[in-house]
Amino acid sequence: MRLILLGPPGAGKGTQATFITQTYGIPQISTGDMLRAAVKAGTPLGIEAKKVMDAGGLMPDEIIIGLVKDRLAQPDCANGYLFDGYPRTIPQADALKDAGVKLDYVIEIAVPDEDIVKRMSGRWVHLASGRSYNTQSNPPKVAGQDDITGEALIQRDDDREETVRHRLGIYQQQTRPLVDYYSSWAAQDPANAPKYRKISGVGSVEEIKARAAAALQS
C-alpha cells in the first residue's frame, strides 16, 4: 500500500495516517523526519540540507526528492509507505512522478473551511499537564478552567482563529491544486496514475476511519 494523504490543516490527517500505517504495517514518511535524520547522519544530502537550513533558505525540491528516494530504498518500505506532508506543491508532485515513485492511492480528506476553523480555534490546553479541551467536542466542565486543577486554560497561537484562517489560505494557494493534479491524472491515465479517492473528514474518528478503510479497498 503506497499512498499520499491530502487535506487541509486540522482535517485529521495525523489520526488517519496512524490508523492506516498500523493497519497495513507501513512506515509514515515525513520530510521533516528525513531531513533531521540525514543532517544527523551527515550524509551528502544531509550536508547540503544543513547548509540551506543554516542560511534560513527554502529547501530545494532536488534535495527533498533525493531524500525521498533514499528513504524508499530502505527495507521497511518494501510493503509500502504513506507520505505525510509531501508533496505540498505541483513541482514536488512532478518531481515525485519523474522519479518514478510508485503510488497506489491518493486520499483526500475533505472538511469545509468553517468546520476547520471551529475545530482548531476551539482548542484550549492546560500547559502544566498537557490536558487539552475543545469547546466544540470536548469542553471543560467550567469554561476556561482545567477540570482537575481549576487553573486557567490557554489557547496556543497556532490555534487562534486568525492563524487558522491564514494557514487555510496558504493551503488553498499551494496544496489544494494537488487535488486537481491527482484527480485529473487519475481520470486521464487510470492505468498509470494512483487511484484518487475523496472522503469526508466530518464525523467521529471511527466514522472517518471506516471511510478511509473503504476507500483503500475500492
Curated annotation (Swiss-Prot):
AMP binds at T31, R36, G57, L58, M59, G85, Y86, P87, R88, Q92, R156, R167. Keywords: ATP-binding, Cytoplasm, Kinase, Nucleotide biosynthesis, Nucleotide-binding, Transferase. One of its GO terms (biological process) is AMP salvage. Its EC number is 2.7.4.3. The keyword Aminoacyl-tRNA synthetase does not apply. Its main location: cytoplasm. Residues 122-159 are annotated as: LID. ATP binds at G10, A11, G12, K13, G14, T15, R123, S132, Y133, G203. Belongs to the adenylate kinase family. Consists of three domains, a large central CORE domain and two small peripheral domains, NMPbind and LID, which undergo movements during catalysis. The LID domain closes over the site of phosphoryl transfer upon ATP binding. Assembling and dissambling the active center during each catalytic cycle provides an effective means to prevent ATP hydrolysis. Monomer. This is Adenylate kinase. The lineage of its organism: Bacteria, Pseudomonadati, Pseudomonadota, Betaproteobacteria, Burkholderiales. The gene is adk.
